[in-house]
Amino acid sequence: MTNFTVIIPARYASTRLPGKPLAEIAGKPMIAHVFEKAMQSGAKRVIVATDHEQVATVARGFGAEVCMTSETHQSGTERLAEVVEKLGIAEDEIIVNIQGDEPLIPPAIVRQVAENLAKYQVKMASLAVNITDPEELFNPNAVKVLTDHAGYVLYFSRAPIPWHRDQFASLPKEKSTRGQLVLSDHYLRHIGIYAYRAGFIKQYIQWQPSVLEQIESLEQLRVLWYGEKIHVELAREVPPVGVDTAEDLEKVRSILEK
């Protein structure tokens, strides 16, 4: 059995939904739902990493271990690195990063991503799902991932990759035809859940941001830029929507309040 620790970055000052970790869903704050899913995964330890005392107080109230972090971090990975350093987590410990806005994340895939890292000689592991809806393929908010035959990542992009030259040739002029496209299994949507060793998190933040990650606004591209490997598996369960907007929050409420 793979041992792993889950860290949940829970930033209070969300641009689109301020106070998001504390948003009430089915009688509980969102962060409580995420914590419960993480606990159900079989993680040996689950830590809420936050920059806000109110989030910390609420999390402690439902029994979570909390690590207070800086308000100045530019990414969730930087926040994880502070937790690893503050708590003295061993360098070979597997860390799974679950975003604090994923109250519906299936516990099975939390364990799956940890096992994925343990199985392969890579610095980072993640998950993906097949894209069957052409509109999702062309949506820049849905991050696409392209892998080789063994699941090692070639690239992440907000663009539709790979670009099927013949199949997509008419799309710029006839966008209405997108719904008629039949997509192959090569098209994958990346799920934003990661596993890495604690020591690699500290290495990652020493690297300067890469040109590609700045262009795409995808921090995982830094790993590829510096020549390291990421392995991606198909998720055993397709995770429902995360919460980025007020509309997403209402969708999740309707699911959990049934």
Curated annotation (Swiss-Prot):
Catalysed reaction equations from the record: 3-deoxy-alpha-D-manno-oct-2-ulosonate + CTP = CMP-3-deoxy-beta-D-manno-octulosonate + diphosphate
UniProt gene name: kdsB
Pfam families: CTP_transf_3
Lineage of the species this protein comes from: Bacteria, Pseudomonadati, Pseudomonadota, Gammaproteobacteria, Pasteurellales
Subcellular location field: Cytoplasm
Keyword Membrane set for record: no
Protein name per Swiss-Prot or TrEMBL: 3-deoxy-manno-octulosonate cytidylyltransferase
GO cellular component, one term: cytosol
Keyword entries, A-Z: Cytoplasm, Lipopolysaccharide biosynthesis, Nucleotidyltransferase, Transferase
Family statement: Belongs to the KdsB family.
MF GO annotations: 3-deoxy-manno-octulosonate cytidylyltransferase activity
UniProt EC number: 2.7.7.38
GO biological-process terms attached to the record: CMP-keto-3-deoxy-D-manno-octulosonic acid biosynthetic process; lipopolysaccharide biosynthetic process
PANTHER family: 3-DEOXY-MANNO-OCTULOSONATE CYTIDYLYLTRANSFERASE, 3-DEOXY-MANNO-OCTULOSONATE CYTIDYLYLTRANSFERASE, MITOCHONDRIAL
Source species of the chain: Pasteurella multocida (strain Pm70)
Biological function: Activates KDO (a required 8-carbon sugar) for incorporation into bacterial lipopolysaccharide in Gram-negative bacteria.
UniProt pathway: Nucleotide-sugar biosynthesis; CMP-3-deoxy-D-manno-octulosonate biosynthesis; CMP-3-deoxy-D-manno-octulosonate from 3-deoxy-D-manno-octulosonate and CTP: step 1/1; Bacterial outer membrane biogenesis; lipopolysaccharide biosynthesis
NCBIfam families: kdsB (TIGR00466), PRK05450.1-3 (NF003950), PRK05450.1-5 (NF003952), PRK13368.1 (NF009905)
Source superkingdom: Bacteria
